[in-house]
């Protein structure tokens, strides 16, 4: 463990830490020594000043995303739950691998991987995909389990997951249930067993209802959207966020049969 800094903000005492974890967990177990390429896992430990030296139970926050960094706090009220949580817990706020102050994955990372396979686009793309697979939920929770075992003496902790953190919660409970006292989620519980088709079959009728409500409120937009859809097959307009616009982007339910 490397202690990077200790400081206070109004109402909170914060420590910044970093540890090494394997880039690839295959062949390694959390809590044990490892070799090969490593990456950095950054995390913060947060308490109130009056509890700095108290033996509080641990709560780890499983951030949303995917690829989300932990909350950046200026006070106990910076994030809605921190004020109450720090009354009872020592709160751990990790940045997931690939995000925040942990070893990042960004466009520069992907460009370096592609450059290593210059001249063979397909091989470069496969190498990029293989690298990104090392940043999935199973690796994220193995990082956290390694953190629990090596830096917190193997003490069991409470988990709280937000959005994608709900998916991390179930992954944690599947792989390392013995390390968890209790789990809370504020959203993002995946379907069990996983079936994306069934999830979207429940989603589409709601989208249809919401679209109808929108057009009731803004009826003039119905003609505008219809006019845009007519032009899309031959249009060259490009959206900053999604690339070339198509009717499937504007209307992702086009061609979908939904039971009302």
Residue ranges and their predicted role:
Residues 235-260:
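Alpha/beta-hydrolase fold active-site neighborhood
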């Amino acid at each position: 463990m490397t202690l990077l800094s200790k400081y206070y903000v109004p109402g909170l005492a914060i420590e910044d830490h970093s540890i090494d974890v394997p880039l690839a967990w295959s062949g390694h177990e959390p809590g044990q020594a490892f070799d090969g390429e490593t990456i950095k896992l950054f995390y913060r430990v947060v308490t109130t000043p009056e509890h700095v030296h108290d033996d509080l139970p641990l709560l780890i926050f499983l951030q949303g995303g995917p690829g989300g960094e932990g909350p950046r706090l200026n006070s106990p009220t910076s994030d809605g739950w921190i004020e109450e949580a720090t009354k009872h817990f020592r709160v751990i706020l990790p940045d997931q691998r690939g995000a925040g102050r942990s070893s990042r994955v960004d466009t520069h990372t992907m460009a370096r991987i592609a450059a290593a396979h210059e001249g063979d686009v397909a091989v470069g793309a496969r190498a990029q995909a293989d690298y990104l697979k090392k940043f999935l939920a199973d690796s994220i929770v193995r990082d956290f389990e390694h953190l629990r075992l090596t830096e917190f003496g193997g003490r069991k902790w409470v988990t709280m997951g937000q959005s994608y953190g709900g998916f991390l919660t179930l992954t944690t409970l599947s792989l390392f249930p013995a390390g968890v006292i209790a789990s809370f989620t504020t959203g993002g519980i995946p379907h069990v067993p996983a079936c994306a088709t069934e999830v979207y079959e429940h989603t589409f009728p709601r989208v249809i209802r919401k679209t109808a409500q929108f057009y009731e409120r803004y009826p003039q937009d119905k003609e505008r959207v219809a006019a845009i859809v007519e032009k899309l097959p031959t249009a060259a307009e490009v959206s900053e966020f999604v690339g070339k616009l198509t009717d499937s982007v504007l209307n992702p339910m086009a061609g979908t049969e939904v039971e009302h």
